[in-house]
Amino acid sequence: MEISTLTTILDTTLAVIFTWVAYKTGQIIWKYTPYSYPNARIRAMEARLLTDQRFSELAESKTLQNFVVSLEDTDYSPRLASLQSYNLYEIERALDLSLVDLVELMIKIMPKRIRGLFEILLEEWDVRNITNVIKAKLSNLPPQDFIIPAGRMFPKVKAMVESKTMEEILVILEGTEYEEPLRKLLLKEIDLQAFELELYKIYYSKLLKYASSRKGEEKLISEEFIKMLIDYRNISIILRAKLSGMPSEEIKSLLIPGGMLSRAVLESMLSSEDVMMALGELEGTRYGDALKDVREAVEGGRIDKVEEALRRYILNRMKELSQFYPLSVAVALTYLLERESEVRKLKAVAKLIEDKAKPEKIKELIGEMA
């Protein structure tokens, strides 16, 4: 073989190798670099999460004013600093708004290709606000006391608050995905509970549709996250409904499609004779180990202990994913769950302080929460 031929082959081979290396390098840069800044920022915020020692100190606050002052050096300070009075309603509202601020921050700093997930997560406030306005209107209560200035439809929510009739609200929601469920409610085709569930079905359907449109790790992580949230709601619905004696067919209509639990498991839970048997159907699932210590609590009607165990499982699973995929959306979703857990605990501390509970009792109850 002539030298010129060998040189040509060598040049071609090197060109192919360099092209492949450049392609792979480009893939890595596209895949991971956009997460470097947001995840570094989130890790810094994660370091500021409240420790058990800090919660013990908060339990000693004695008054809500002291409780708020004790949080001045935390990420809750911007919202708590604007309080007009130190009452439980205002404090809980400020804590909720701190979570809204967090999701809005994620929308700003996360890579464009996953930003839509957080935009849809923000829509849960649309569901909450719309549901709360309808509930308040039907109960002749002031709806403005039950809404949070958050969500993508807040201008419409404000218009709903000012409306005089339910028909006006239907006009306000015209053209949105929430119009039809409200129409069914007004026609008495569904009750208020079913109306709320219809809104949540729309919400989770949008989340799943978005997650399934992603690629690679982003699809894997976001789909598992959303499906676990759906399982959480479905398990809670089934167990609470079983406890209240609701017929299986009625429970089935309340379930949200798209979770990780198989249809067979859900059907077995639905056909179970009682709440304990329904819980037993989860033993062979991914949630089995997490729920093995709550049977006694469930026998006493404490479904909240199941919910705590499931929240703890979901958080731990997301932590695993964030460790396995350190430059991914798992880091942001894990931190969001951590902050939601922290807010639940802070609300509980505030409520117990208002109720004049002893610090020792507050510490005991908070230590059990998830």
UniProtKB/Swiss-Prot annotation:
Gene3D superfamilies listed in its UniProt record: ATP synthase (C/AC39) subunit, domain 3, V-type ATP synthase subunit C domain
Source domain of life: Archaea
InterPro entries reported in the protein's UniProt record: ATPase_csu/dsu_sf, ATPase_V0-cplx_csu, ATPase_V0-cplx_csu/dsu, V-ATPase_V0D/AC39_subunit, V-type_ATPase_csu/dsu, V-type_ATPase_csu/dsu_dom_3
Keyword Transport on entry: yes
GO cellular component entries: plasma membrane; proton-transporting V-type ATPase, V0 domain
Subcellular location(s) per record: Cell membrane
SS bond list: none
Gene Ontology BP, a term: proton motive force-driven plasma membrane ATP synthesis
SUPFAM superfamilies, A to Z: V-type ATP synthase subunit C
Keywords assigned by UniProt, alphabetized: ATP synthesis, Cell membrane, Hydrogen ion transport, Ion transport, Membrane, Transport
Family the entry assigns: Belongs to the V-ATPase V0D/AC39 subunit family.
Assembly: Has multiple subunits with at least A(3), B(3), C, D, E, F, H, I and proteolipid K(x).
Function (record text): Component of the A-type ATP synthase that produces ATP from ADP in the presence of a proton gradient across the membrane.
PANTHER family for the chain: V-TYPE ATP SYNTHASE SUBUNIT C (PTHR38682:SF1)
Protein name: A-type ATP synthase subunit C
Gene from which the chain derives: atpC
